[in-house]
Structure formats: structure tokens, C-alpha cells
Amino acid sequence: MCGINGYVGTRGGAIEEMNSKTLHRGPDSSGIFQDSHITLGHNLLSIREVLEASKQPVTKPSSPWVLVFNGQLYNTAAMKEKLDKAYSGVDLDTTLLFGLIEKYGWNFIKHIHGMYAIGLYNKEEARLCIYRDPTGQKPLYYYAKGSEFIFSSEIKGILAHAHVDRSVNEESVLLATMLGYIPGSGTLFSHIHKLNPSEVLLLDCKNIQITKEYYHSDARGYYGDKKPQEVFTNLVAEHLQSKQKVALNLSGGMDSSLLLHEMSQVGHEMHTYTNRFEASDEKFNRDADLAKKLAKDYGATHTEITITKKLYLDNFIESYAAIEEPNYNITVPTYLITAKQEGAHGDKNRVILSGDGGDEVFAGYPHYWEIRRMEKLRRLVSSPIFNLIKNRRNGTSFDFSHAEDQWYFFRRMHDPILKHKVAYDRNLLSSITQPFMQNYGVKTDPVYQGMLMDRVLWLAGENFIRSDKIYMSQSVELRSPLAYHPFRQYFDELLSSSDYIEKSGNKKFLRNLYRGKLPEYITDRSDKTGWRSPLANWYDKTFQTLFLSIIEPMKKSNHIIDWERIARQIEEKEMWPGKHIHAYLSLAILAQQYDIEL
């Protein structure tokens, strides 16, 4: 895992500043490439191999190619088979990737699977392409205005260029107030964008001409004739590739529990982490209790990280600032506290496994049950009548035959608190989802369609952005095996509507597969708290004071958002105002960090 940076041109000192701003992503080594058209930079977090073999940008004297790469590729065995015998003893994915580039040129992308953000430059063509992986696990940002083009793994890398236009993207602000984050390609800045999953940007460095397109990553046949249980074991074995120890975030839920089981099956040393919340309602530590019990049953070395109210408040501003984008998730400070304990300044882990991504493959969220129930109701009455009933009850104007409307109905955060009222517009979402749906939306099952919506809008737009920024701030690579694209495609083809949900709960197929392997207290549990901080219990005057201190400087702008109204919501309530307030707190933190008006 690393940080990649670059820009068109040869401005002295700029790449060094970009590398410096993103050094936390790769503290082991920094490198630079420059020719008359482009400057590229790289920060290395060494995971697989000795330092010298891992350094980037990758070049060869006789080759026109220059590579900067952030991520991990897991199909290294298949990559070796496509290269000559000189690569037979190579384990480093970067070396294998460069070998494929030399063999296949721009078509290399058809032969790799993993999580990645890639910058590839051809010196002879003066052409740059930047790529984001199909699941969106690795963010990649770019700035495009006039003859200027800059890209980086993080927004702060782009803002290292002092002249960058910081004009605000009002549409992105609207999305943040509707959803609590910004899905798709938008950021708070009009001229800074992020690549979407499966998107490639092509840049003619001589004429500064940009084209964008989507590539289809076809992983059919990846697992051959393997049965589902074999696929899980193979998946985890591939994701354990590392010269460093690999630990696991163990939540007590199905997804992380099955990862622990598969780690034990391949004989991997098991180190697990979970959170315990100080002085909170018993229900908030139910998951911690189960995780502790499961770790003991499997003989894992288990660490509990205690989250106190003081720690939460002390890390509040830093955690939301680290994400660089607005975020409504109330557990953001908890994630940072956890990453600090696990990472470079704590236990010095470099690789952590996470169960993220399983809910969007095996229908884990409660709203999937509701989607199926609504579909049954729509069959009983005509769609217009159904829409009328639901809209009258909720004061909205949705057409539930559209996946975007149905998704927004369940996923919307709160009515936006803006200076001027704005109505929901389906086009805001469909412009993001349609390219993705054209490649992967082959099944019409409403639960599957709901999972696709979550994959492209929420998982890539919120979850992976948050987890990447938080963990990389502590020089830790977070891997999410259950979001692996070949794994997704295998189960998307295998499962149907009847496999997702049963009367006893969601994840029907997964629970049945692991019954008899995992303990019943995991496979048969009907409730899961999730890693949610107990703010309703903790909230007091110290929270209110902090929240108001963050909002107060924003009152003088009042340009897009009604900050006065938000302040009143905090002032007038003795209880926690709700998760929507965290979206506005994060917007205020970022506005002050970036010196912009909202």
C-alpha cells in the first residue's frame, strides 16, 4: 500500500511537497520520475518484499513505461503464468504488474485482480492513464482545469499546489447533506474529482486532452470448478499474502468471524482486535463479548481497544479531517482510535483484514428485507398506487420502480438543512450508478439491485474512502477480502433471490454454509449491534460545547448551508441531535481546514 502523486509539467519542488503531504501512506521510501511532459511521485509502504525491489516509480532503461501503483494484487499466481520463466520466483506484485505492462501494453488491466489505484505513463506516446479498481477500495483524485492536471491518492496531495482553484462544488455539498457523504466522482471542490470504480482516465500530456471510460473486469472462471467453501478458503489465503503479520478486525458478526475461521484453516497465526465501549449500555458491548469468546475458542491472540468518551472527543476533529470528505458516520473517531492502536504508533501492524463488503454480496443489511417486502407489495397493487401510498406517508415523490429511488428511500440521511430548499433529483444518483449497472446489473432481482446500489454508492463512496484514509493515516493497509471482485462475481452468478433472505434473517446462504463450522452463537444470532459508538448514552455538555465550537465559525458564511439552524438544533437539545449532525460537523471541519465557504 502506498501513495501516488503526479502532474503535467516540471515545476520544481512541487512533487517533493506532494510526497511530503502523503508520506503517512508510505513512510519507507519516496521516489520521483520526471521528463519534459510529466512528473510522478511515490511513497512506499513495504508489505511483501525487501525495500529495494519495491521502490517506485518503476522504470527500465529500455522500456517506455513508467508505473506508480498503490494497492495489492491477489492473482499473482495467474500473473506469473502469463509471463516467462524469469518471473517464476517473483512474489512482488509490483514487479509482476510491470512485466504484464511490458507484455500487454495498455491491455494489462484485463489481467489483474485486486484493490488498486494505478498511474501508468508511456514516454514515447507522452500519454498517462490512471485507474481505480472495480470495487473502489483505493481512492484516486485528480484536478483538471485549463492546462493544469494533477493527481494524487489524497486531496491534500493536490492542495500542495498553492495555485489550485478551491471553488466549491454545490452539487457535492447537496449530496453530502442528503446522504452524509459524496458518492461518485464529486468532492467539495469544483475542479477536484475522484475516479469511480472501474474508471480509467486517459491524458494526452502534450495537448492536455482528457478522455474517460469504464473498463469491464471479467473474472468469470477465476475459481474454476471450486465449490463455495473452497472459494472462501482460497479467497482468504490470497488475502494473507504478506511478509508482515496479518491481523483481523473481529466484530462478532458473520463476516469477520468466517474470516477468522478461514485463517485457522490455512494455518495462519491469528491476531484479532475489537472495541469495547466504556460505561455504556450493555448492548453496545454485546459484539465485543462475542468477539472475545470466538477469539478464545479459536486460540487467537485477542486485543480489546477500550473507547472512552474522552478518547472519542479528543480524536473527533482529527478523525473527520483525515477523511478529507464529508462523512456522517458517528463511529469515525472510534475507527481512528482503533487504527492508532493497531498501526505505526501502536502495535505496528501493517496489514489488517476487515469483513467490509460481505453485506453487499450476501444481503446483510435490514433494508434488503424491506426491499423484498416492498417488491411483494408492488406486485399486489399497481406501481402508481403503491408509489402514492408510500409517498403520502413519507412526504416524498419517489418512483419505486427505479432502483435509485428505492435505494435513496432507505439510505437518505435527513432533509438537507440548506439556505434554499432543494428537491430530490434521481439524476444525481443515476449519473453515478448507470455506468456501473451496465457492466454488473445483469439480474433484475430487487435485492441484488439494492446490493449493486450499495456497492457503487455507499461502499465505494463512503466505506472505502473512510477506511482507506483512516487506516493509511496510521500507515496500515486495510484489506477487505469479501469485496474482492472475482469473489463477488462468483457468488453473483451462483446465488438467486431465494438464497439471500429467510424468515430467520438475512445472509441465508452464508449462515447455512458455515453452520457446523462456526459456533451457533455466531451463525444463529439474530441481532448485531455493529461498531456504533454509544453517543445517545455519552452525550452531555462536553459534546455540546465541542459541537458548537465547530459550528460557530461557520455562521459568518451561511452561503449554502443554514448554519444558524444547525447551531440551534445543538443548543436547544440536551440529548444527542442524531447522526445527521455529524455530516454538518464534518463539513464545518473541512471548510475551516480548506478555507472555503459553505
Feature annotation, model-predicted:
Residues 292-476, 522, 526, 548-551:
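Glycine-rich active-site loop/lid subdomains used to bind and stabilize high-energy intermediates
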Residues 484:
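Short, conserved phosphate/pyrophosphate- and ester-handling motifs at nucleotide-, phospho-/glycolipid
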Residues 501-523:
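Charge-dense polyanion-binding interfaces
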Residues 518-574, 578:
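PAPS-dependent sulfotransferase catalytic core
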Residues 77, 488-492:
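Short, solvent-exposed hinge/capping segments at secondary-structure junctions
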Residues 1-323, 350, 516, 564, ...:
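Cysteine-centered catalytic environments shared across enzyme families
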